[in-house]
Amino acid sequence: MIVYPAIDLRGGLAVRLAQGDYARETRYAEEPLALARRYADAGARWLHLVDLDAARTGRFAHRELVARIAAGSGLRIQAGGGVRSLADVEALLAAGASRVVVGSAA
Protein backbone atom coordinates (compact mmCIF):
# COMPACT_ATOMS: atom_id res chain seq x y z
CA MET A 1 0.00 0.00 0.00
CA ILE A 2 1.21 3.52 -0.79
CA VAL A 3 0.01 6.37 1.42
CA TYR A 4 -0.15 9.80 -0.23
CA PRO A 5 -0.04 12.63 2.29
CA ALA A 6 -1.72 15.68 0.79
CA ILE A 7 -1.21 19.42 1.00
CA ASP A 8 -3.82 21.78 -0.38
CA LEU A 9 -2.34 25.12 -1.42
CA ARG A 10 -4.24 28.40 -1.31
CA GLY A 11 -2.66 31.83 -1.19
CA GLY A 12 0.76 30.22 -0.80
CA LEU A 13 -0.30 28.47 2.41
CA ALA A 14 -1.12 24.92 3.39
CA VAL A 15 -4.87 24.81 4.03
CA ARG A 16 -7.76 22.40 4.39
CA LEU A 17 -11.29 23.16 3.26
CA ALA A 18 -14.22 21.74 5.21
CA GLN A 19 -16.14 19.65 2.68
CA GLY A 20 -14.67 21.68 -0.18
CA ASP A 21 -16.15 24.95 1.12
CA TYR A 22 -13.77 27.87 0.52
CA ALA A 23 -15.55 29.83 3.27
CA ARG A 24 -14.61 27.16 5.83
CA GLU A 25 -10.85 27.07 5.51
CA THR A 26 -8.29 25.98 8.09
CA ARG A 27 -4.85 27.53 7.57
CA TYR A 28 -1.84 25.68 8.89
CA ALA A 29 1.01 27.64 10.45
CA GLU A 30 3.67 25.43 8.93
CA GLU A 31 5.13 26.56 5.60
CA PRO A 32 4.22 24.05 2.84
CA LEU A 33 7.83 23.02 2.13
CA ALA A 34 8.49 22.41 5.84
CA LEU A 35 5.30 20.35 6.05
CA ALA A 36 6.39 18.31 3.00
CA ARG A 37 9.78 17.68 4.62
CA ARG A 38 8.03 16.51 7.77
CA TYR A 39 6.05 14.00 5.69
CA ALA A 40 9.31 12.83 4.08
CA ASP A 41 10.93 12.46 7.50
CA ALA A 42 7.96 10.30 8.54
CA GLY A 43 8.66 7.93 5.65
CA ALA A 44 6.45 9.21 2.85
CA ARG A 45 7.73 8.75 -0.70
CA TRP A 46 4.98 10.65 -2.51
CA LEU A 47 3.11 13.89 -1.86
CA HIS A 48 -0.23 14.89 -3.35
CA LEU A 49 -0.38 18.68 -3.94
CA VAL A 50 -3.56 20.50 -4.93
CA ASP A 51 -3.55 24.11 -6.15
CA LEU A 52 -6.93 25.25 -4.82
CA ASP A 53 -6.50 28.69 -6.36
CA ALA A 54 -6.11 27.12 -9.80
CA ALA A 55 -9.03 24.78 -9.16
CA ARG A 56 -11.21 27.79 -8.45
CA THR A 57 -9.94 30.31 -11.01
CA GLY A 58 -8.32 28.20 -13.72
CA ARG A 59 -5.03 30.10 -13.31
CA PHE A 60 -2.09 28.42 -11.64
CA ALA A 61 -0.81 30.33 -8.67
CA HIS A 62 1.66 27.87 -7.19
CA ARG A 63 3.96 26.53 -9.93
CA GLU A 64 7.01 28.03 -8.21
CA LEU A 65 5.93 26.57 -4.87
CA VAL A 66 5.40 23.16 -6.49
CA ALA A 67 8.93 23.45 -7.91
CA ARG A 68 10.38 24.38 -4.49
CA ILE A 69 8.60 21.49 -2.80
CA ALA A 70 9.65 19.02 -5.51
CA ALA A 71 13.29 20.14 -5.31
CA GLY A 72 13.50 20.57 -1.57
CA SER A 73 11.50 17.75 -0.03
CA GLY A 74 12.93 14.59 -1.57
CA LEU A 75 9.37 13.46 -2.32
CA ARG A 76 7.88 12.52 -5.66
CA ILE A 77 5.04 14.92 -6.40
CA GLN A 78 1.56 14.15 -7.68
CA ALA A 79 -0.02 17.52 -8.48
CA GLY A 80 -3.49 18.65 -9.43
CA GLY A 81 -6.04 21.39 -9.13
CA GLY A 82 -7.18 23.42 -12.10
CA VAL A 83 -5.47 21.21 -14.68
CA ARG A 84 -7.50 21.84 -17.82
CA SER A 85 -5.10 21.46 -20.74
CA LEU A 86 -2.00 19.70 -22.00
CA ALA A 87 -0.10 22.96 -21.40
CA ASP A 88 -1.12 22.80 -17.72
CA VAL A 89 0.14 19.21 -17.50
CA GLU A 90 3.43 20.16 -19.15
CA ALA A 91 3.89 23.13 -16.82
CA LEU A 92 3.44 20.98 -13.72
CA LEU A 93 5.79 18.32 -15.06
CA ALA A 94 8.35 21.05 -15.82
CA ALA A 95 7.94 22.29 -12.23
CA GLY A 96 8.98 18.88 -10.95
CA ALA A 97 5.76 16.90 -10.60
CA SER A 98 6.12 13.21 -11.41
CA ARG A 99 2.37 12.76 -11.89
CA VAL A 100 -0.43 15.15 -12.75
CA VAL A 101 -4.08 14.66 -11.82
CA VAL A 102 -6.47 15.88 -14.51
CA GLY A 103 -9.97 16.83 -13.39
CA SER A 104 -13.22 16.18 -15.17
CA ALA A 105 -13.33 19.75 -16.54
CA ALA A 106 -10.36 18.99 -18.81
Where in this protein do the model-derived segments appear?
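Conserved N-terminal beta1-alpha1 strand-loop-helix module at the mouth
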Residues: M1-L75, V83-A87
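Conserved phosphate/oxyanion-binding catalytic-loop motifs
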Residues: A79
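Glycine-rich phosphate-binding active-site loops on the catalytic face of alpha/beta enzymes
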Residues: V83, E90-A106
